[in-house]
């Protein structure tokens, strides 16, 4: 019996896939649990329509994320910190500091999306990668200056 999956099932496939299963498995488990629909002509057409609508939404969101990434690429953050000897900072500039500086500029970014291997502990210019979306990354310039 052919069914359309409405949930991701590791043993069968992804949402929206049409798979062939035993009729008893479909009637006794998949249909009552709401994990699948029977693959009738009407359901297949509805699935195709949903896929097209979802693809259009994804493309729109992708374009918006590309626009945000472009704006972030143009940002240069200037952070002032107290300095000890030889241009070393008393503390450090962490992902949280970069996140709050970006928020002041109007960009809402999760701290985990800021790709900073180690905190910045010296004066200078640095580039930091910021993940805007799963496949889209931007780079932000970070300048650490001496606070007077």
From Swiss-Prot:
Cited Gene3D superfamilies: Ribosomal protein L9, C-terminal domain (3.10.430.100), Ribosomal protein L9, N-terminal domain (3.40.5.10)
Function, in words: Binds to the 23S rRNA.
Entry protein name: Large ribosomal subunit protein bL9
Organism from which the protein derives: Syntrophobacter fumaroxidans (strain DSM 10017 / MPOB)
A biological-process GO annotation: translation
Family: Belongs to the bacterial ribosomal protein bL9 family.
PROSITE patterns, per database record: RIBOSOMAL_L9
Source superkingdom: Bacteria
Molecular function as annotated in GO: rRNA binding; structural constituent of ribosome
PANTHER family: 50S RIBOSOMAL PROTEIN L9
Keywords attached to this entry: Ribonucleoprotein, Ribosomal protein, RNA-binding, rRNA-binding
SUPFAM superfamilies xref list: L9 N-domain-like, Ribosomal protein L9 C-domain
Gene Ontology CC terms: ribonucleoprotein complex; ribosome
